[in-house]
Amino acid sequence: MVKLKGLRQINPYVAGKQPDEPDMIKLNTNENAYGPSPKVAEALQNFDAQELRKYSSLDQAELCQALAANLGVSPDQLIIGNGSDDILSMAFLAFFNSGESVLFSDLTYGFYKVWADLYQVPFREIPLTADFEVHPSDYFGDNGGIILANPNAPTGIYLPLKQLEEILASNQDAVVVVDEAYINFGGQSALPLLDTYPNLFITRTFSKDAALAGLRVGYGIGHPDLIAVMKAVKDSINPYSVDLLAERLALAAVQDWDYYLETGRAIQETRDWFAEELAALDFQVLPSQTNFVLAQPTRISAAELFQQLEERQIYVRYFPKAERIKDFLRISIGRREEMETVLAAIKEICSS
């Protein structure tokens, strides 16, 4: 590496592979197999490319209005970003500046640790229980803030709202960020707690339930005072972070939310069926409220199953460097016919 002063050394986030093969089944990055709403496709077709000569809006007012009506909050409780990763990254800059350690789980979304390192925020990883669950009392006591994925990734396990409220009630002098990327696959949102806990900040994405991972739109929900701090950070980095096309297509998605409720139900039904089928093959399957399952094979190693699935152009996620789940595979939930093909391949591999 070239030797120059001031170069930053950091361990970056490692994303899942993005293969592009015609007959593959891609189940490694929790994308939505059903695709965007037809209204999104219509909005894309009707978009006037001449509009791209102008900068996008600063506050995404129309999208905020639609989201506010959908969620039952006011527009001043919302901020839109370039994916929920953008919102979460800004949250580290906006909320975690006390000098005390920020708390998050030892087995959760890998970006949290990366952002803490990047922004030089002290942190402490709280071990999940032996059953991969969050124990609320582990988050009591002095800290510089908390960030929890609920449901968690990569485990898929959901923390009941009552237990989440225990954490909020015990940390009212610090911001508690709840990452709800997967909340619409069976969990109960923390939205009802917003009026009681001004220290609560929720993040959401259009990548999972709205099938717009390639568009990069996410949002944060919280007390107007928290939103004001977030907007100040956003305007200090890139006030135009949400492009015009993304805003228009996200708006079309919100306006056709019944479509996503329907596809979400289909994903949940397929997930529950697939989990039962894996359990019948002696897999240990963690209870999931997401669009994926984390499962441990017992008749074959996770590494071998991962390799043999990949040879069949079936891509799942393997975490060989994560000690607690190195014997597990994370498998996204596709359409029923895709999952039947995957199940048949797993049966063939496990019986050979």
UniProtKB/Swiss-Prot annotation:
Keyword Amino-acid biosynthesis: yes
HAMAP family: HisC_aminotrans_2
Gene3D superfamilies xref list: Aspartate Aminotransferase, domain 1 (3.90.1150.10), Type I PLP-dependent aspartate aminotransferase-like (Major domain) (3.40.640.10)
Keyword Transferase recorded: yes
Positions of post-translational N6-(pyridoxal phosphate)lysine modification: K208
Enzyme Commission identifier(s): 2.6.1.9
Gene Ontology BP annotations: L-histidine biosynthetic process
UniProt similarity note: Belongs to the class-II pyridoxal-phosphate-dependent aminotransferase family. Histidinol-phosphate aminotransferase subfamily.
Cofactor: pyridoxal 5'-phosphate
Organism per entry: Streptococcus gordonii (strain Challis / ATCC 35105 / BCRC 15272 / CH1 / DL1 / V288)
NCBIfam families reported for this sequence: hisC
Reaction equation(s) it catalyzes: L-histidinol phosphate + 2-oxoglutarate = 3-(imidazol-4-yl)-2-oxopropyl phosphate + L-glutamate
Pathway: Amino-acid biosynthesis; L-histidine biosynthesis; L-histidine from 5-phospho-alpha-D-ribose 1-diphosphate: step 7/9
Any one GO MF annotation of this record: histidinol-phosphate transaminase activity
Keywords noted in UniProt: Amino-acid biosynthesis, Aminotransferase, Histidine biosynthesis, Pyridoxal phosphate, Transferase
Name of the molecule in the record: Histidinol-phosphate aminotransferase
InterPro entries in alphabetical order: Aminotransferase_I/II_large, HisP_aminotrans, HistidinolP_aminotransfase, PyrdxlP-dep_Trfase, PyrdxlP-dep_Trfase_major, PyrdxlP-dep_Trfase_small
Quaternary structure, from the entry: Homodimer.
The gene coding this protein: hisC
Enzyme category, top tier: transferase
